[in-house]
Amino acid sequence: MENKKSLLKKLLKTNLLPLAFLGDSVHTLIVRENSLLKDDVKMASYNSFSSSKCKAQNQAFALKQIIDRLNEDELEIVRRARNAKPKHHAKNSTSADYSFATAYEALIGYLYLKEDQDRLIEFLNSSLE
């Protein structure tokens, strides 16, 4: 299996939707892990919390909250991912929210493969607030 750095290099040369796919998985994992840290919560509440935090609207909002803190490389990832043309979008979101959510997920995937844990945690925490 390729290491993270070489995979990142490969993905940056192409469409960023695979990076968003990875970022969505990372985001979902952290959200679910965070929900388990809450005391005495029923399973239905875990699912409800996770579902609410993983919606396109929440991810779009999170990106808008952090956009002023992004460096040039991160802004380029966001720009390219927003301009990507997915074949569909979530039925419960607008195409604008879906576009921003895709950009947020691509950014998370980028930071994960880049192994920039500090930035990754900083930005993931913004989506949990």
Label for each model-derived stretch:
Residues M1-E129:
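Double-stranded RNA-binding/processing signature
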